[in-house]
A protein has these predicted regions:
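Short, compositionally biased
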Residues: 178-183
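Glycine-rich phosphate/pyrophosphate-binding loop regions near the starts of catalytic domains
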Residues: 15-171
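Single conserved hydrophobic/aromatic residue that forms the stacking wall/gate
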Residues: 1-7, 11
Length: 183
């Protein structure tokens, strides 16, 4: 199977979304690629993105490595910011659980703090929801905000023939693709 049939077709979903826009500060900056939304702010832009860890949560539970999902959640978001040239500034989290679990939340919190430290951004808030009718186990997501000067936005339009590409070996699948990896 491919990713769109195993999980969700992100690109199809994005094509279905129509934005509400304003003019001046707060006006959306259109990007054809990337996972961060940008809005004008003076000569700069606020970059924002929301992401979760997905089905890697199941693997983290099996390996008793829950603290890693906090790090992964921050990384998934801040990586989306830096891909457009934005410096990560702030992160907020959302954790939904089927029942209160102080030990689980402490481990997730330690991971979130470490992820923010590694990303050089502030952990500035969050929400914990106890939703036994909707959630079985737990889920985590977060939102990152960053800043970039508008003339420094990376959008792919300045790529040209003859540019040097640098490829780095990945240390692993990070937090993407676990739905397929587990199959």
């Amino acid at each position: 199977p491919d990713y769109s049939s195993a999980a969700s077709d992100v690109y199809k979903r994005q094509a279905q979304i129509k934005g509400v826009n304003r003019k001046g500060d707060g006006e959306a900056i259109k990007l054809d690629n990337g996972f961060a939304g940008l809005v004008k702010l003076g000569d700069g832009a606020l970059a924002m993105c929301t992401d979760g860890v997905g089905s890697k949560l199941l693997l983290a539970e099996q390996m008793n490595s829950i603290h890693t999902v906090g790090i992964d959640c921050v990384a998934m978001n801040t990586n989306d910011l830096i891909c457009v040239g934005a410096e990560p500034l702030s992160f907020v989290d959302y954790v939904a659980l089927d029942k209160p679990d102080e030990d689980l939340m402490a481990k997730i919190g330690m991971g979130l703090a470490e992820g923010c430290k590694q990303s050089n951004c502030t952990l500035s808030g969050g929400e914990t929801a106890i939703l036994p009718e909707l959630v079985h186990g737990f889920d985590i997501a977060g939102t990152s905000v960053g800043y970039v000067k508008q003339d420094k936005i990376i959008d792919g339009t300045k790529i040209s023939e003859g540019d040097v590409l640098i490829g780095l070996k990945s240390s692993g699948p990070h937090s993407n693709g676990y739905t397929l990896i587990r199959k």
